[in-house]
């Protein structure tokens, strides 16, 4: 059953976990996803929320430099394929023009199947 159907017609509480995309220093996407997969197989999860991590400049300089992270859609697609749990990419939409967001949504749906 798809996550949208689970939300519309819940038979039990819907569980969504948030997992940050791996940092470049964490190794390959495949190895990171394999580790996550073994953890997720031990519990019941309906979907995985993957946030888009951005530097926040509004509050001034960060004490710790933000690490470059994997593309959330690539990571989400990989987790869907390996774990079989739907991914939700939590995108920060205020940074782009509407036309660019429409292209992003179409690409996310068609290329990454999210």
Which role fits each region the language model picked out?
Residues 1-114:
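Active-site beta->alpha loop and helix N-cap motifs at the rims of alpha/beta catalytic domains
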